[in-house]
Structure formats: structure tokens, C-alpha cells
Regions:
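Carbohydrate-active catalytic/glycan-binding domains of CAZyme proteins
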Residues: 25-538
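Bacterial N-terminal signal peptides
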Residues: 8-19
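N-terminal secretory signal peptides that target proteins for export/translocation
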Residues: 1-5
Length: 538
């Protein structure tokens, strides 16, 4: 049986006009009135409740949160630059995506050919200041059976340097220059020829003159042969200004792409005052579309760092680089963004990767402020200077894979590649006891299951001397008979996915009423327990 359930935020994420409403009360018990539907409550087959998501787990006692950075793979970069004459000989820029589909890991990235810049002027900050040649920056494809060893298939679709023996994907109606792209697979689209979707950071032109960064949406049936989703014909790799789908302000539009609440969201980098509340320097904005063709021109300031509300010279402060790449976990969005460390000189600027989370698909937050989740490499390493957040996240067996890229090294030298970072499955963050001499516990937001539910725990350090007591409460935090007190479940073993057994059975039966989960840390060796996730599903 497939279970559908949703995570409710209690108190409700909304405001009821015209009468009081008890949190968690059935809809039929509510008086007449108006409910403002702020936020989303997606119904999914299995929900993941993480310690760093303080909306899904808002209540704690004597527990501390820790984030766990992944380990870089010793064979990095797992996808290096191509050989001389290849369309990616200058750079493999993983402003791209990895999608697991039909038994393969499929990777899209920006291939940078030789001589991709023109020098505009000598400049103290840029040394020298350059402009991008759009047709030297193209969308390319690689694939793998294990996510570590990659091949570049000869697709024969696009010509480069007089040959079609390359891995460039087809982009119609004409080649389009891209500096950033993201790809998702959308199996819900009734049209099979549109089930792969790509957001492209390109540029518009006006009367042949290159303008500002903008968004171009593209669709494909196989992920290799793409067509623009809008009626537009690029010229010299640029989109006509009249064909733009979002406001023509500079917006680097392909930092992340995801579908949430029935809408497609394009996350990107902006640096101009286009939102009601703005920040200084690079910040994260989001635009939305119901069909991937018509994009709403009202946007959102989705994320900026705490220090960005103080004015500093452009590029010199702490900023948020290139949008948020998103791992859609069904009931919550996890993401990476560029932690920009500014400098008056371009060569002094560096970028690490930070970790964020969202429960509404619009606003993101850092569980720990300015925490560096993946750190740039040391001098002379392949990923020195800075990292870029490709949208590549997968659970593979007992590990979590996160793919990332190397940024501009601060010069006009060849750059890039795709790296892999790994950690134990879903162990991105944990709760542990702060003081083992006093009680420690946490409680989730309300979960509403339609049908019998099962609970699993991802934890380590659990034993007969270090246990987790799990109890269920209703939405008003009254203990549920048979699932609390003497009916509580006691977890005595560690693992990535340990099922919870209640005295009355493994399952949590209906009726379809919201319940909360309380987890208490107990035992002489309680200090060694780490809780990484709860899973509710079938």
C-alpha cells in the first residue's frame, strides 16, 4: 500500500479571519471565515524530518544541532576538462545538474571552448576586464553508471570546430550561449517531449548589442535534443530582448531549478533593487511559472546573508553567489549556495558552499549562520579559489553523493571540473545531548497520515545503555494511548534506517488525524547518541 501523508506546521502557517481556529482541528470543525494559505503542505509517500529543519522539528530540550560536511572524493575531479580540440578544453563549468534516470546518472554542464573571452579594457579590479563570447559556452552531457566514473558520449548533434564528434547537446532553433544551466526530469508532464526541463542563464540582445543576463527555458524528450520552450530565435548565441520571460534587469537565472507546489521555480543571482526588501551585493532571487512557458514577473528575495544589509562596495563584502541548487526531498528542500568572500581585487575573491533549507519553496534559511558545508581547495588544488554549486544530489546505497564544481580561479586560465563529495546516507546534520545530567528530547511538527504509517530512525550511538524513547501525541500535544507512556517504543540499535516497533505493532494506524512524534534520549551512555533523521512512510 502506498501511503500519502503531509507534514503540518503547528501552529498553522496561515491566519484565519472571522473566527478562531484550533490548530490541527479537522476542516469540518472550523467556523466560516477566510484562511490565508501561507506556505505549502505537500503530501508525499515518505517524509524526511531532519534536525536542521526547524519547521519540521521546531521543539527541543537540551539538544544541540551539528552539521556534518561531506568528504571530498580522492579521485576528484571525477569529470575533468576535455582534451585539446574538445568543446570543453578550456573549462568544465558545473553550473549544471545530475539526474538519476533509467539506471544512469546523467550530467549536464557548461562546456567552455578555447579562447572564450575578449579583453574589453585593462581594469584594476578585474585585471583585465573581459567579456564572454557566447558561442564558446555551450551545454554538454556526460553519463555514468556509478556517479564516479563518467563518459562523454559522441552525440553527433552539434558542430564544434568543424566536427560533430562531441558531447554537445542539440539546442534549437539555434545555438544559444549559456553560462549556467539546471535540468530536472518532470514525469508528471503529459507531453513526453517536455519531460526534461532546462533553465538557462543566457543574455538578451537589443539591435545586436549584448545586454544583461536573463532566463531562457528549454524542454526535451530525451535530455539530449532540446528546444526553447518559448517562441524565440537566438542571434549569435543571444536571446532577443523582446523574447525575455522575466524582467530585463540583470538576473543570473539558473542557480537552481525545482518544482514545488505545482509551480516551477528558477533560483538565481541578482544584485539590483527589484524586490520590496533588498540586500547589498549578490543575493538569491526566485521567479515562478505554472507551465515553464509563462513566467510571473513578480519575484522574491529568497535568501541573503545576515551581513548583506550593510552597504559595502560591490564585490568586496560577504555575499550570496549564484542562487541555490536544490535537492527536493518531497516535504522539504535542501540546498547549496555560494558563500562569497569579497575583496577589492578579483583575485582575492573566494567562494565556499553553504547549506540552506526551505519548507515553502520561496524562502530559504541557514540552519547555522555562515556555516561552510564544502570548503574550497587549497592553493594549487584543482578546486582552489572557489566552488560552484551544481544541482547534483543522490542517495546511493549507504551514502549520499553531492557533486560540485570549481569556480573561476581569478585569472583567464583554463578552469573547472566536476567533483564529488560524500557522506553516510542522509547524515548531513544531527541532534545530540548537550548536558547528559538533565533530560533531553525533541518533538516534531504535526504529521498527517492517510493510512497506516511506519516510522524509521537514522541514528548512531544507540544501544541498550543509550536508548531513544519514541512517543506519539495528537496535534494539541496530548499523549496518544498505546503510543506513549507504557506504550512508547524503545529504540536500542543504531542504523541508517531502523524501524520503530511499538508494543501494539510496527504501524501507526489511522484515523487520519495529525500526530506529533516526541523523541527522548535516555540511558547511561546517552551522550554518544546522534539522531540524523526520522522517516515516516510505508
Amino acid at each position: 500500500m502506498k501511503l500519502a501523508f503531509s507534514v503540518r506546521m503547528i501552529p498553522l502557517l496561515g491566519f484565519v479571519l472571522g473566527g478562531a481556529c484550533q490548530p490541527g482541528a479537522p476542516t469540518g470543525d472550523r467556523p466560516d471565515g477566510v484562511t490565508v494559505l501561507v506556505g505549502t503542505r505537500p503530501t508525499v509517500a515518505e517524509a524526511s524530518l531532519f534536525p536542521f529543519d526547524n519547521h519540521s522539528i521546531p521543539f527541543t530540550q537540551n539538544v544541540g544541532l551539528k552539521l556534518h560536511p561531506p568528504r571530498k572524493h580522492p579521485g576528484n575531479p571525477v569529470l575533468p576538462r576535455g582534451p585539446e580540440g574538445a568543446p570543453d578544453e578550456f573549462g568544465v563549468q558545473f553550473y549544471g545538474s545530475v539526474v538519476r534516470h533509467e539506471g544512469k546518472f546523467k550530467l549536464w554542464y557548461v562546456a567552455i571552448g578555447r579562447d572564450p573571452f575578449t579583453v574589453v579594457e585593462e581594469d584594476m579590479m578585474w585585471t583585465p576586464r573581459v567579456d564572454i563570447i557566447p558561442l564558446k559556452w555551450r551545454a554538454a552531457y556526460a553519463e555514468s553508471t556509478d556517479g564516479i566514473h563518467w563518459t562523454r558520449p559522441a552525440l553527433g548533434l552539434e558542430e564544434y570546430d568543424g566536427s560533430r564528434d562531441n558531447n554537445l547537446v542539440l539546442m534549437e532553433p539555434a545555438p544559444l550561449g549559456v553560462i549556467n544551466l539546471k535540468v530536472i526530469h518532470d514525469p508528471e508532464d503529459p507531453d513526453p517531449s517536455r519531460r526534461f526541463k532546462m533553465s538557462l542563464h543566457t543574455w538578451w540582445h537589443e539591435e545586436g548589442k549584448k545586454g544583461l543576463a536573463t532566463l531562457a527555458p528549454a524542454v526535451s524528450g530525451d535530455g539530449l535534443r532540446w528546444r526553447l520552450a518559448i517562441p524565440a530565435t537566438p542571434e549569435n548565441g543571444l536571446l532577443p530582448k523582446e523574447s525575455t520571460v522575466i524582467p530585463t534587469d540583470h538576473f543570473e537565472a539558473a542557480g537552481g531549478l525545482y518544482k514545488w507546489g505545482g509551480l516551477f521555480h528558477a533560483s538565481g543571482q541578482g544584485a539590483r533593487p527589484v524586490y520590496a526588501v533588498d540586500s547589498w551585493g549578490r543575493s538569491v532571487g526566485t521567479y515562478r511559472s505554472p507551465d515553464f512557458v509563462r513566467w510571473e514577473h513578480t519575484g522574491t528575495l529568497s535568501f541573503s546573508r545576515e551581513g548583506q544589509h550593510k552597504k559595502v562596495p560591490s564585490g568586496s563584502g560577504e555575499e550570496s553567489h549564484e542562487g541555490i541548487s536544490v535537492w527536493n526531498r518531497g516535504n522539504v528542500l535542501l540546498g547549496l549556495y555560494g558563500v562569497w568572500h569579497g575583496s577589492p581585487d578579483w583575485r582575492g575573491r573566494t567562494v565556499d558552499l553553504g547549506f540552506v533549507v526551505s519548507n515553502d519553496g520561496v524562502h530559504f534559511r541557514e540552519p547555522l549562520t555562515d556555516f561552510i558545508f564544502i570548503r574550497r581547495g587549497e592553493d594549487h588544488e584543482w578546486d582552489q579559489g572557489g566552488l560552484i554549486q551544481g544541482q547534483g544530489f543522490e542517495n546511493v546505497g549507504e551514502e549520499t553523493y553531492i557533486w560540485y564544481g570549481a569556480w573561476d580561479p581569478g585569472s583567464l586560465e583554463p578552469r573547472g571540473g566536476v567533483g564529488l563529495a560524500t557522506l553516510e546516507r542522509d547524515r548531513l546534520g544531527s541532534f545530540s545531548v548537550r548536558d547528559d545530567s538533565i533530560p533531553a528530547a525533541f518533538m516534531t511538527a504535526a504529521v498527517e497520515a492517510r493510512g497506516e504509517a511506519t516510522l524509521w530512525v537514522n541514528a548512531e550511538g544507540v544501544s541498550e545503555d543509550a536508548t531513544l524513547r519514541l512517543e506519539l501525541y495528537d496535534a494539541l500535544e496530548r499523549p496518544l494511548a498505546g503510543y506513549s507512556g507504557e506504550g512508547a517504543a524503545l529504540l536500542t540499535e543504531s542504523g541508517l534506517r531502523v524501524p520503530v516497533s511499538w508494543p501494539e505493532g510496527n504501524g501507526i494506524p489511522g484515523p487520519e488525524k495529525p500526530f506529533k512524534i516526541k523523541v527522548s534520549f535516555e540511558g547511561e551512555k546517552v551522550a554518544g547518541i546522534r539522531v540524523y533523521a526520522l522517516y515516516v512512510g510505508t
